[in-house]
């Protein structure tokens, strides 16, 4: 990871998902992608906050290591998001088959998740309820932080004069008003 950082790496996606942890090299051990991402202050990262991919402890560890300003909340939602149980494609245009049951998308053999089916308001709720993140910080992690990561925070991500005002209204339980 250090070499990648020297070449310009600034962000890692989907913290903990398909990432190496501690690597054993003979009698020695070295940190993998997970440990590097958590320890390197200049790296930003994101968590799939669906309440399935990561337990509360891993969400809390990510928040503790990265803070509210370097950790983005993503849904990683696929085509089955907000849809009834069934078979949906995920990934590329033609996609790979996934099974959505009780709101959870898995591979057909049920050995892994196939993206997620949550919407952003649900991800914010997960961060508040499972990771004990204050609501205002969870909203920032779903708006300003991602905008900053992709370099559009001068236009999006917060309510400020001169920025695009994308507003979503929700109630106390973070259900979106239509």
What are these regions (language model features)?
Residues 1-31, 82:
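Histidine/acidic-residue-rich, glycine-tolerant segments that coordinate divalent metal ions
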Residues 1-3, 56-62:
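Catalytic cores of alpha/beta
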């Amino acid at each position: 990871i250090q070499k990648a950082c020297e070449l310009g790496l600034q962000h890692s996606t989907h913290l903990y998902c398909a990432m190496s942890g501690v690597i054993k090299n003979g009698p020695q051990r070295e940190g993998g992608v997970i440990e590097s991402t958590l320890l390197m202050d200049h790296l930003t990262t994101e968590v799939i906050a669906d309440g399935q991919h990561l337990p509360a402890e891993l969400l809390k560890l990510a928040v503790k290591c990265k803070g509210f300003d370097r950790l983005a909340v993503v849904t990683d939602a696929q085509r089955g998001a907000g849809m009834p149980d069934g078979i949906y494609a995920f990934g590329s245009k033609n996609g790979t088959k996934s099974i959505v049951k009780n709101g959870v998308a898995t591979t057909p053999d049920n050995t892994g998740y196939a993206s997620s089916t949550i919407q952003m308001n649900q991800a914010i709720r997960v961060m508040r309820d499972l990771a004990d993140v204050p609501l205002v910080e969870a909203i920032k992690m779903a708006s300003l932080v991602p905008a900053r990561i992709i370099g559009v925070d001068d236009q999006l991500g917060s309510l400020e004069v001169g920025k695009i005002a994308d507003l979503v209204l929700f109630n106390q339980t973070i259900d979106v008003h239509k």
